[in-house]
Amino acid sequence: MREGALGVGSSLIYTPANFAETDELIALVGAATEYNGRYISHLRSEANKLEEAVLELIKISSITGAPAEIYHLKAAGKKNWYKLENVFNLIETAKASGLRISANMYTYAAAATGLDATMPPWSQEGGHDEWVKRLKSKKNRDLLSEEMLNADSDWENFFMQAGPEGILLTGFKNPDLKKYIGKTLSEVSNLRGTSPQITAMDLVIEDNSRFDAVFFLMSEENVLKQIKKPWISFGSDAGAIANEGVFIEKGAHPRAYGNFARVLGKYSRDEKAISLTEAIRRMTSLPASNAGIYDRGQLKKDYYADIVVFDPEEIADRATFEKPHQYAVGVEHVFVNGIQVLNHGKHTGALPGMVVRGPGWSGWDTE
């Protein structure tokens, strides 16, 4: 924390973080609060045990006193869509009691992660090499196939939440597998003549990676419900990538290019789901304050001049799941720390970015 961290983050559906128990997280977050740190979590479940996972986050916040945020709030899997209203009630009750609970979201009904999310944690214990080794064992493959088909598993089973037809393969390292980019796991399974479970295992082995995929898990109705909640900020859950060079050799989730323009265009201007003023607040000052960053996110004296100039009548996302590598349109100028980096839609070549440090930063004096 003295070196500038904003707080403690956890990704509790992934190994090795999913082996962490609540008491361990409380101890870590408690230490961060000594430096005004926050807690942010990719919940232990976004599906079958969503409500329990939200209660765990609320408990951690209650015991430690730390503000807590949920990474990309969602109810994953059709049978869990109804749970979103329950989650709203849990969070809003906690907020009313004085806890500082918030969440962020991206405005698409599909998630993106690796194929490790389709297999149980025990198969991945010990790291990647051990995982691949287990996938080559006939005994393990039979057991994994059975567990992957269990819709009521006690782990976050994206294989069943999305279904093979709802898992879009978007990125491989192995050149021989790139022909499958843009196809669903179901389609590749049919092409290869193996079950979807075995196909997933074989692709992990052949690519020697967790490789990327898009999972169609959520409902558009729930996306709209979340957009209307004033305590949910907007975030892409993606890196900033370019539509050129090595970046276009693999697929992507369209949120990497279009999330913010989609809020301003589709949901604010076109569908009137949120006012323009509120949309801007929830992608600027709200996330900045939630993260404990108090000199950014507003056009205000003594704040860093991070400014976007866009045409509200033209701004729109262009990226799709079929053709994700497309920039949004309608953004004319961008200033970062007062330096122009986009001029009439063209990059100036300037690189004025700065490291943003948390409230506990001691100027590197960590003795």
What is the predicted role of each segment?
Residues M1-A17, L25, V29, K59-S62, ...:
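Active-site neighborhoods of metal-dependent hydrolases
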